[in-house]
Amino acid sequence: IRVGGYEECADAQIIVITAGPSITPGNSRDRMVLLEKNVDVMNNIMEQITRYTKDAIIIVVSNPLDILTYIAQKKFDYPANKIFGTGTLLDTARFNKMLGDLCGVDAKNVTGFVLGEHGSTSFIPWNTVNIVGVPFDEFEKQFELKEKLDKEKLLHDTKVIGLDIVELKGYTSSGVALSACRLIGSIVRNEKSVVPVSTVVSG
């Protein structure tokens, strides 16, 4: 790891943007409080990047994620298909882990997506959630559950667990870093994976 200037983006294949302040313990639990400062940060970064390249794939991690991704896609005449955010990939991983734990199975066997905006307005399309083909509504018949499954509680816990980590640890790092690495790996290996990212949808 070393410090470099924006000119080094000229031949970059992938650029990951994590800059800007984050929410802190005891502060607001709403990522939108970061909006004004992080919009300025994003504008500055994109102005610098676009001086040197419009070829690299840009992955946005900074919050509020979806708004910053929108700004990066819309404002700088950068190819929109080369900019996206980590989206609800981390929310999805957390949900699958919680559901797997409740059902006594490895999270890798859980298929379920958290969709929408990263944060308080995300949602879960329950009719797509399954464990090795067993649909959500049949989990109570097929698995020895640790507790009764409550859709509202599962969604709520998925939304707030990151904020709870901030209160306990002071920041989040590992989960979102793994999400970014997951996307980078998918791109580099051309995996053709289906993952929930932040992007502007037209049409």
Question: Where are the model-predicted features located?
Answer:
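Acidic ATP/Mg2+-coordinating residue in the GHKL
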Residues: 18
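General small-molecule cofactor/ligand-binding pocket signal
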Residues: 2-4, 84, 113
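Rossmann-like NAD(P)(H) cofactor-binding subdomain of soluble oxidoreductases
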Residues: 29-96
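Short, internal active-site loops enriched in acidic
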Residues: 7-9, 63-67, 117-119, 202-203
